């Protein structure tokens, strides 16, 4: 069987070859490039761009398994994958610590004005400069005695809560309609509505996945609910925030500042208004990275494909409903799954 890999520095061709698979590799900038690479493949490692769309999957009749690095699978059309009997695999939990650490670092960069003061120090200002000292003292803040809000209370949101608790906030509140209060209690967190979180939190950190429900969850209306002194951090997915609305809100000082590891369009356009605002920090979607993450994730991403094509459960399955689709295929028109070991028990969800 053939495995197609979009070229990255982290591909583990050796694992596929040791398992007896043929490996092809290529760089893909367009949908046509991706189709050309995947059209004869049984399994594929795909990246964020180009999108693995319905058209791509339809053009690849042998494709059975897609595997993405990390947790996010918003670059894959999950509905199409499920309809066509294609597993969409991810690697949950592998970079939870890295993203939670980065979110805390970004919040501290805002509360302590780290980026501003590094710049002004390089320009010659120092603590003895009265102007700098007064300005700094008027705007720098502590986390203690403030309310921290978390949007999305999955693994990363919980890891963030654990870390931020050490700074002594007055309260930690969270919004996640899929989590029970008994779970939040384990972290000393109070679940609230989105409106209550936005109106009460001094610091807000976003850790939700990108779905139709959460796309532009933070928009002109929800931004208007926040305190004018609110600080907003996003290390989840860019389109959770309406970027244009956020830029307007920051420019008008309707909220105080934002720190973003992700943007609505990536890579971010050099002319994006957010980049020109002094009250915004942007990092290039690297919150989840570390040498440990890359090593673990590259192995698990490959194992997802090897295991699924061998009848074993992958590390993560983003479209568990596909199991029923494949079961029907096996009993009627086996198609792409003909000859592959039955994994219905191993993948039962």
Q: What is the predicted function of each stretch?
A:
Residues 26-27, 47, 69-70, 86-97, ...:
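Short beta->alpha connector loops at strand-helix junctions that form conserved
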Residues 84, 92-147, 159-162, 167:
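Phosphate-binding beta-alpha-beta segment of Rossmann-like dinucleotide-binding domains, i.e.
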Residues 1-41, 309, 325-349:
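N-terminal glycine-/charge-rich "phosphate-binding" loop or analogous flexible N-terminal tail
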Residues 1, 18-19, 134-228, 336-349:
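Rossmann-like dinucleotide/phosphate-binding beta-alpha-beta segment
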Residues 88, 220, 229-349:
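Rossmann-like dinucleotide-binding domain for NAD(H)/NADP(H)
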Residues 51-63, 78-80, 213-232, 243:
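Rossmann-fold NAD(P) dinucleotide-binding segment
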Residues 6, 46-47, 69, 106, ...:
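Short, well-ordered coil/turn residues at beta-beta hairpins
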Residues 38-43, 61-63, 199-204, 227-229:
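Short acidic/histidine-rich motifs immediately flanking catalytic phosphotransfer sites
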């Amino acid at each position: 069987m053939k495995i197609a890999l979009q070229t990255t520095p982290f591909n583990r061709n050796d694992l596929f070859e040791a398992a007896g698979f043929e490996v092809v590799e290529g760089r893909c900038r367009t949908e046509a490039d991706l189709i050309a690479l995947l059209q004869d493949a049984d399994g594929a490692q795909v990246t964020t761009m180009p999108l693995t769309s319905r058209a791509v999957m339809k053009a690849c009749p042998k494709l059975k398994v897609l595997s993405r690095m990390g947790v996010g699978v918003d670059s894959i059309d999950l509905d199409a994958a499920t309809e066509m009997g294609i597993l969409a695999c991810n690697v949950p939990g592998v970079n939870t610590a890295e993203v939670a650490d980065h979110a805390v670092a970004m919040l501290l960069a805002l509360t302590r004005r780290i980026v501003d003061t590094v710049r002004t120090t390089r320009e010659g200002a120092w603590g003895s400069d009265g102007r700098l000292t007064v300005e700094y003292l008027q705007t720098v803040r502590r986390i203690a005695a403030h309310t921290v809000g978390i949007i999305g209370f999955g693994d990363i949101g919980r890891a963030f809560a654990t870390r931020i608790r050490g700074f002594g906030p007055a309260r930690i509140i969270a919004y996640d309609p899929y989590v029970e209060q008994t779970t939040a209690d384990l972290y000393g967190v109070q679940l609230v509505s989105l409106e209550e979180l936005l109106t009460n939190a001094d610091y807000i950190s976003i850790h939700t996945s990108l779905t139709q429900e959460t796309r532009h969850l933070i928009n002109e209306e929800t931004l208007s609910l926040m305190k004018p002194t609110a600080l907003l951090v996003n290390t989840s997915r860019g389109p959770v925030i309406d970027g244009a609305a956020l830029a307007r809100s920051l420019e008008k000082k309707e909220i105080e500042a934002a720190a973003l590891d992700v943007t609505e369009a990536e890579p971010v356009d050099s002319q994006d208004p957010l980049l020109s605002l002094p009250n915004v920090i942007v990092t290039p979607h690297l919150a989840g990275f570390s040498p440990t993450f890359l090593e673990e994730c590259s192995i698990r991403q490959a194992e997802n494909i090897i295991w699924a094509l061998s009848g074993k459960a992958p590390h993560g399955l983003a479209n568990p409903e596909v199991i029923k689709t494949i079961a029907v295929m096996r009993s009627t028109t086996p198609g792409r799954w003909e000859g592959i070991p039955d994994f219905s028990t191993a993948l039962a969800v």
